[in-house]
Amino acid sequence: MLDLKRIRNNPEEIKKLLSNRGEDFDVAVIDEIVTLDEERRKILVEVESLKSKRNQVSAEIPKLKKAGEDVTEIMNDMRKLGEEIKNFDTRVNEINERIEYIMLRIPNIPNPEVPDGETDEDNVEIKKWGEPTKFNFEPKAHWDLGTDLNILDFERGGKVAGSRFTVYKGLGARLERSIINYFLDKHTTENGYTEILPPYMVNRDSMTGTGQLPKFEEDAFKVENNGYFLIPTAEVPVTNMYRNEVLSGDILPIKHAAYSACFRAEAGSAGRDTRGLVRQHQFNKVELVKFCKPEDSYAELDKLVEDAESVLQGLGLPYRIVRICKGDLGFTAALKYDIEVWMPSYNRYVEISSCSNFEDFQARRANIKYRETPKDKPKFIHTLNGSGVAIGRTVAAVLENYQKEDGTVEIPEAIKRFMNVDFIK
């Protein structure tokens, strides 16, 4: 959520900054907010004047009665004044609801470093690590490898649940678990994160706090009759752990690493990546979430990206980093980097992590603040998050990049201690 004061003072600047944001967003609502805010402030001034008048007259009525004067007309005037105040209060409530409705749907303002552009083709590559894997044979796609090795069962996943669900079997299940363990160990013992195991269901306030609601409700799995949502990412419960709290500045930054299952309807992705593990309704992920002071947030973002990189480097998977352009930035981020792993079956890099600085956008929605001392006025914190990284896509990348001509898959050195085998065959 943006700062209403900033909108009030600089509406044209805000409209300009949001005009090429790439969201389905009409900047004309900024003018509506300014108009409503001005009306509300005028009403509040008028209400205060009316209440002051009512209090003064109310204090005089007993004196007039004691003096034997007729106060009938004055009492009638007071009732009318009370109705007027009530009507003003009703209008203020209507304005508040409308402003909140609009504010919850305004995307974040891009950082000046965000490149111009409309689609993912305009994202800017800033780094490559490793070289795309070369083969002296025709490599298989991970869905074929998984089926041939009897470690991924897409058919039974579909039978049990439907399309975009997978059953992991045998060494496939162990590979998934090994990668989870490796990621969590790396982030907690080397990268300085505290491990969190969050709830997999959250309430509406939590989904609103991180920006999934109201805009992306169609992509969420909702549990009917009780208002719970299955989490699309551990970012939601971990960020909302501190909702409506004022944190002490001396404990910042807070760094959490959370493994969870994630659930997404993928309503806008019909026909995309329909085979394999790349786009599933349910998948596992290790999420990195940070809370820090505003002046530290971009340095913390750089470190967050490095932490996500570290697990891919440990697995020896080639990847690149792109800075996301304005048109592809999404709703909540002020600046975002995608880490894309090389996927031989696609003959291109595929997103495996997004690392974002939301600045105070989520903190305003979730009301997360900090202060240096108990006497200081609380200020909104900055929140960041990144995938550290998506597990299913890592499984796919390992299978494809480590496959051998005989159809077996070598286990990366970093996870052999968890797998207890050198090859899947």
UniProtKB/Swiss-Prot annotation:
It is found in: Cytoplasm. The keyword Protein biosynthesis applies. Pfam families: Seryl_tRNA_N, tRNA-synt_2b. GO terms for biological process: selenocysteine biosynthetic process; seryl-tRNA aminoacylation. Pathway: Aminoacyl-tRNA biosynthesis; selenocysteinyl-tRNA(Sec) biosynthesis; L-seryl-tRNA(Sec) from L-serine and tRNA(Sec): step 1/1. Its main location: cytoplasm. It is an enzyme of class 6 (ligase). Keywords: Aminoacyl-tRNA synthetase, ATP-binding, Cytoplasm, Ligase, Nucleotide-binding, Protein biosynthesis. SUPFAM superfamilies: Class II aaRS and biotin synthetases, tRNA-binding arm. Gene3D superfamilies: Bira Bifunctional Protein, Domain 2 (3.30.930.10), Serine-tRNA synthetase, tRNA binding domain (1.10.287.40). The keyword Ribosomal protein does not apply. CDD domains: SerRS_core. L-serine binds at residues 233-235, 287, 387. One of its GO terms (molecular function) is serine-tRNA ligase activity. ATP binds at residues 264-266, 351-354. Its EC number is 6.1.1.11. InterPro entries: aa-tRNA-synt_IIb, aa-tRNA-synth_II, aa-tRNA-synth_II/BPL/LPL, Ser-tRNA-ligase_type_1, Ser-tRNA-synth_1_N, SerRS_1_N_sf, SerRS_core, tRNA-bd_arm. One of its GO terms (cellular component) is cytoplasm. It catalyses: tRNA(Ser) + L-serine + ATP = L-seryl-tRNA(Ser) + AMP + diphosphate + H(+); tRNA(Sec) + L-serine + ATP = L-seryl-tRNA(Sec) + AMP + diphosphate + H(+). Belongs to the class-II aminoacyl-tRNA synthetase family. Type-1 seryl-tRNA synthetase subfamily. Catalyzes the attachment of serine to tRNA(Ser). Is also able to aminoacylate tRNA(Sec) with serine, to form the misacylated tRNA L-seryl-tRNA(Sec), which will be further converted into selenocysteinyl-tRNA(Sec). Homodimer. The tRNA molecule binds across the dimer. This is Serine--tRNA ligase. It comes from Clostridium botulinum (strain Eklund 17B / Type B). The lineage of its organism: Bacteria, Bacillati, Bacillota, Clostridia, Eubacteriales. The gene is serS.
